[in-house]
Amino acid sequence: MKFELDTTQGRARRGRLVFERGTVETPAFMPVGTYGTVKGMTPEEVRETGADILLGNTFHLWLRPGEEIMRKHGDLHDFMNWQRPILTDSGGFQVFSLGDIRKITEEGVHFRSPINGEKIFLDPEKSMQIQDSLGSDVVMIFDECTPYPATEDEARKSMQMSLRWAQRSRDEFDRLENPNSLFGIIQGGVYEGLRDESLKGLVDIGFDGYAVGGLAVGEPKEDMHRILEHTCPQIPADKPRYLMGVGKPEDLVEGVRRGVDMFDCVMPTRNARNGHLFTSEGVVKIRNARHRDDTSTLDDKCDCYTCKNYSRAYLYHLDRCNEILGARLNTIHNLRYYQRLMEGLRGAIETGTLDDFVTEFYTSQGREVPEVPELTD
């Protein structure tokens, strides 16, 4: 992987990730394909929304279908018929989410399968092996997602163990002679000093990119912004910056303003299935009875298949009847909305009009433009 940085405006960056399987324009949003599929969508449909890269879930693909079946197909690209770049998370966040059915030790994580209750052990080495079998273009280190709230001492212990796991991930990745890219994950909770220590340790080990982890786990939005404002300028400028698991459209806008290059989140797909649709004027709740006889398009500024062909009344009808097509059309729209947002951000950075773009983004939804501190490096 090669990261090319074209231009900046403030801390916002316009560039691209160049892989053998294709180029990813940044800032980029990665749709989430947990089980090797973006729910309800064919790979071709996902590509048509403008996606250059997908995120796969190491933990779930390890449990089902497993490494053996994956290797029989070649890798995840062949298994799901997506011949463009794939980033896989390490499984650390999913283990974190298991709560009471997992036990974390220095060696790794003991837990019971959420599928059948079987006892399972996952450690940095195994995570690297699984991601190797998936053929991931971007592999994420195995880490512990520091919970919120956590005391500074708790966050320090968690972060320091994640650093040790980062070294083990690096060593196993190299032992496997994996030709792809490995990203480190910065932890440290809401404590700036711990974030500094984490980043320094990761840079000393050496990675192809750096993710900001442990955010969007319940902390106030102000804390997320503060950590990004503090951390992003310290990440080596020639490496991509990835904000994991974020988020709402405004989170992407605010992340880009603070120097983030990559995002992923289940929000556009999950919200689509629940009838919450993102538009240029805000969220439309298609289940609301006001849409029952509305012949207008969902968003007249959107060029997606759904908006070009169907009315709000039809989408309301499909949802009320629990038709699968409704969820599919909603998903197509939400994914295209996110990709159009990223296209707009990239274009605004290129032309030096990011401030105008941000103002229009918020005012078109009847919202105030949030203040951003003077961002000087």
UniProtKB/Swiss-Prot annotation:
The keyword Glycosyltransferase applies. It comes from the Bacteria. Its EC number is 2.4.2.29. One of its GO terms (cellular component) is cytosol. Signal peptide: none annotated. Its cofactor is Zn(2+). Pathway: tRNA modification; tRNA-queuosine biosynthesis. It catalyses: 7-aminomethyl-7-carbaguanine + guanosine(34) in tRNA = 7-aminomethyl-7-carbaguanosine(34) in tRNA + guanine. Substrate binds at D89, S90, G91, G92, F93, D143, Q187, G214. One of its GO terms (biological process) is queuosine biosynthetic process. The active site is at D89 (proton acceptor), D264 (nucleophile). Keywords: Glycosyltransferase, Metal-binding, Queuosine biosynthesis, Transferase, tRNA processing, Zinc. It holds the Pfam family TGT. GO terms for molecular function: metal ion binding; tRNA-guanosine(34) queuine transglycosylase activity. Binds 1 zinc ion per subunit. Catalyzes the base-exchange of a guanine (G) residue with the queuine precursor 7-aminomethyl-7-deazaguanine (PreQ1) at position 34 (anticodon wobble position) in tRNAs with GU(N) anticodons (tRNA-Asp, -Asn, -His and -Tyr). Catalysis occurs through a double-displacement mechanism. The nucleophile active site attacks the C1' of nucleotide 34 to detach the guanine base from the RNA, forming a covalent enzyme-RNA intermediate. The proton acceptor active site deprotonates the incoming PreQ1, allowing a nucleophilic attack on the C1' of the ribose to form the product. Belongs to the queuine tRNA-ribosyltransferase family. PANTHER family: QUEUINE TRNA-RIBOSYLTRANSFERASE. This is Queuine tRNA-ribosyltransferase. It comes from Shewanella piezotolerans (strain WP3 / JCM 13877).
